[in-house]
Amino acid sequence: MSAICWNCRGLGNPCTVKALQRAVLEEDPILVFIIETRLVVSEMEVIKSKLDRQPGLVVPSIRRGGGLALLWRRSTKVDVQTFSPHHIDAIVTEEHNNRTWRFTGFYGDSETNKREESWRLLEELSTRSNLPWLCMGDFNEILHLGEKVGGNLRPEGQMRSFREAVNRCNLRDMGYIGAAFTWSRRLGDRGWVRERLDRALVSSSWVTMFPEVRLHHVAASTSDHCMLVLKAPRARQRKHRRSKMFRFESMWLKDEQCEEVVSEAWEKGKTIGTQNLFTQCMDECRRSLSSWNKNKFGHVGQKISTLQKKL
């Protein structure tokens, strides 16, 4: 079982799309819940294609604000029950083991005076099914003062309303691995404010069904929210290793050696093998560029991952 949830703060930025692509490629999640897409349905269709997650439901943005999307693997059966600008509720059936459970992607109202409406929605959703339940998203609220540093103190009544709603829904916070806060913003000369606004709430029966699953906070440089990655510790070991796809990096063109590497590889490709000449040359270029990249720049993806963990 694996899922990704992210308040991306808009998918109009190519770097944001690439960050999401990278996470989906690495984790191969059953579900991807995206908050604040800031896109209409037709624009999200392009994103779905890039993520190789064609099945899905899109709640379009309103005047370039908000917008939700729930995407899933083709092999997973997902029956969407209800949706709104603040949630997508679905029943999930995993193909390989026929386990059925409930997923709700949730987006709490960003306006404090409308937060009670969000909790009423959450409580209403809790009455609709007895299936094992995972409710994941950006709730725009904290449970207690320990989930915030910097800025003004949060009113106790505001936090208590959230806690009481969670309790009435028979849900509990499942904890996390990683940084203590999922959202941050600089307040000018007053420093930073950091809060844990994003989380996963689960029912006891969901924990029983997935006792090994843990929530990870993953830093993302293109949004002020962390990405939430839900996965089992052994998930990476169970994945079958596939041949790595060759990708030409645009940054190579900025290095003068790149042209020389390609030229030498192309000439070498003309003199070896018995395949189609063009295929021989392309294969040799791929091998030479991959080797040159490793020696010249190192493992860029690994470096990015290491820096994200440090953040």
Protein language model features and the residues they cover:
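A shared catalytic/ligand-binding motif for oxyanion handling
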Residues: 1-311
